[in-house]
């Protein structure tokens, strides 16, 4: 049986669709694109009207879940996750989740509390991320490491070696999980190798979104290729 989910992405994102194709054929992603609400502002949330319309369209495709794959948007308002998931659910008629929610919940599901955030973002956005994970998910950020990307295009140009080298620089015993936010940051095919090298789980935006999808569908299937989170699919 094929299961269908919707995923909303910024119009500039060039990675999410590629990583969705790595999923088993039984899980089909249907994508809607969103325009930024504030042109020229770095990592601003997408337009409400785009979110509503694209969610409505995805609902006509009979998706069972809608995911907003725009982690940075959740960092700009305390109630953003709650407001946007209500908007998405109202449009599509199905449950909704943000990728930021998925990341936080995934870390908790792995039984961890202390994280290192290795992101493509600037220092200011990283600080927002640390506050978000603390206030929304009770996670302590032990280390923040950013690459200073100023837009989504720059994130898409990063490679797995950027994250791996950052892990090597900042790794320490108190870090329980490496968190790599950013849906346009290509990570999926490197997660298992990172975990083997550093001996701890890695949670990334797209991987956590797929975990949330598997949990929502409750099929019991595991996907062992992309790190511990998808190999175990822990409840959370």
Residue ranges and their predicted role:
Residues 1-53, 121-159:
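N-terminal glycine-rich anion-binding loop in soluble enzyme alpha/beta folds
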Residues 84, 91-150, 230-235:
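Conserved beta-alpha
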Residues 85-107, 194-213:
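Short, acidic/small-residue loops that bind anionic groups at enzyme active sites
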Residues 146-154, 200-222:
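Short, flexible loop segments at boundaries between secondary-structure elements
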């Amino acid at each position: 049986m094929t299961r269908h989910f919707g995923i909303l992405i910024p119009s500039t994102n060039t990675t999410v669709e590629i990583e969705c194709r790595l999923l088993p054929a039984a899980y089909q992603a249907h994508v809607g694109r969103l325009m930024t609400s504030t042109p020229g502002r770095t990592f601003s949330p997408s337009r409400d009207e785009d979110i509503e319309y694209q969610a409505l369209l995805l609902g006509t495709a009979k998706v069972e879940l809608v995911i907003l794959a725009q982690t940075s948007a959740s960092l700009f308002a305390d109630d953003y996750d709650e407001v946007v998931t209500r908007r998405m659910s109202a449009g599509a008629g199905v449950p909704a989740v943000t990728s930021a929610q998925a990341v936080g919940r995934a870390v908790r599901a792995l039984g961890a509390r202390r994280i290192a955030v290795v992101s493509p973002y600037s220092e200011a956005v990283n600080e927002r991320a640390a506050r978000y994970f603390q206030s929304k998910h009770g996670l302590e950020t032990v280390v923040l490491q950013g690459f200073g990307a100023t837009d989504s295009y720059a994130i898409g140009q990063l490679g797995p070696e950027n994250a791996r080298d950052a892990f090597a620089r900042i790794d320490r015993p108190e870090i329980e999980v490496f968190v790599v936010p950013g849906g346009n940051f290509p990570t999926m095919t490197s997660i298992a190798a990172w975990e083997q090298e550093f001996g701890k789980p890695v949670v990334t935006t797209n991987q956590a979104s797929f975990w949330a999808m598997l949990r929502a569908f409750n099929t019991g299937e595991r996907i062992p290729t992309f790190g511990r989170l998808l190999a175990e699919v822990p409840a959370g």
